[in-house]
Amino acid sequence: MSGHSKFANIKHKKEKNDAAKGKIFTIIGREIAVAVKEGGPDPANNFKLAQVITKAKANNMPNDTIERGIKKAAGDVGNVNYEYVTYEGYGPNGIAIIVDALTDNKNRTASNVRSAFTKGQGSIGSMGCLSFMFDKKGQIIIDKEECDMDADELMMIALDAGADDFAEEEDSFEVLTDPDAFEDVRKALEEQGIPMMSAEVTMIPQNYVTLTDETAIKNLQKTLDLLEDDDDVQAVYHNWDE
C-alpha cells in the first residue's frame, strides 16, 4: 500500500506533551469516566472504553490504575458531568485547526480556546466551517522496534480485518481504517499480540499547507502550544505541513 502517511504532522498529540508533565493519567481518567457513563464498564461491549484502555496502555498506565478508574467511574456515574465539545478555527494564513475538548465547564473552555486563537492572530469559526477539509479515520500506529512481524505479514492481518491502508515509515507502521471498521482492526491486531503506540479515531487533513513566513509560524505555534497546555483539550488537528 502507499506510504503516504504524514501522521507525525497530522495531530499535535497532547498525550506526548502531557506525559512529560505528569498530566496524561488525569486526562485518560476523564475519558474513562465518560466512556463508562456512556457505555458501561465492560470494554468488550463498550467501544469507547476499549479505545481509552488502548490509549492508557500505550502511555504506560498501570493495569491496576486503569481498573480502579473503571470501578470508580462505574460507582460514580451520576456525578460524571464531563462532555465533549469541538471547536473549529483558523490559524495564520488560513491554517485549519480543529480542537476536541472534554470539559465540565463549556464557558471556561470556549473562552480559553478563543484566547488561544486570538493570541496567535487566528480566529474561531462556526461549526462545520473546516471539518469538510478533514477525513475521519481510524488510525493505529505500531512501533517497529516493538513489533516482531515483518511489514507484509502485518499488512495482511490489518487488511484482512478491514483496514483501508497500510504505510511503512522509518520507525513505525501506520494502519488507516474507516471509523466503522476501526474496532475490528484494532481487535485483530491485539489478538495477534501486536503492541500499538496509539489507536484512535482521528481527523486527517485532505491537503496540507506550508508556511514560510517566520511570524506566521511563530504565531501558529503559539496557538497550538496554548491549546495543548489547556487541561480541557484532548486533541488538536491541523493541516500545517510542519
Q: Where would I find each of the regions flagged by the language model?
A:
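N-terminal cationic and glycine-rich segments that engage phosphates or anionic surfaces
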Residues: 1-125, 130-141, 238-241
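Positively charged, low-complexity, intrinsically disordered RNA-binding extensions
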Residues: 139-242
